[in-house]
Regions:
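A detector for short, charged/polar N-terminal pre-domain segments
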Residues: 2-9
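Short helix-adjacent coil turns
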Residues: 20, 27-28
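A short hydrophobic beta-strand element
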Residues: 85-94
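Short beta-strand edge/turn micro-motifs at domain boundaries
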Residues: 108-134
Length: 134
């Protein structure tokens, strides 16, 4: 698939964000990892690095059963654009609400995702999550 404009990039990014949001809100770590490439890199808000979709899923399973149990997230696409054939970069705003734990309350973050076309699907290959200070 050859992308030619921003609307194409948005059409690629939005379903991925929907899948991430639905999985998070269901507390489904492996579902959250679903749109990630097998060899994806994920940098989380504290700077930790997870390599591979399986690691992303396991990491999220762990936080959904502990510090983020019962949390919800809302993802909003700020911008998506193509940067080359089969490559989309998406900037995303995240609002996560945690009922308890060290992140209790409303937390905002910004994410940068590199989404690539591989094996006839679009997958996140790079993901960087940065906590936004109040």
């Amino acid at each position: 698939m050859t992308l030619t404009n921003t609307s194409d990039a948005v059409a690629i990014a939005e379903p991925i964000l929907e899948q991430l949001e639905q999985a998070w809100n269901a507390g489904d770590g492996m579902g959250f990892a679903g749109p990630f490439a097998e060899d994806a890199d994920f940098v989380e808000i504290r700077g930790g690095h997870h390599h591979g979709a399986v690691a992303v899923g396991r990491g999220h399973e762990a936080i959904f059963s502990t510090i983020y149990a019962g949390s919800t997230v809302e993802l909003q696409l700020e911008k998506a654009r193509t940067v080359g054939p089969g490559v989309v970069v998406a900037l995303v705003h995240s609002t996560m609400t945690a009922p308890s734990g060290p992140m209790q309350g409303v937390n905002r973050a910004r994410m940068t995702m590199v989404i690539v076309e591989e094996d006839e699907r679009w997958a996140i290959t790079q993901f960087h999550n940065t906590l936004v200070s109040a």
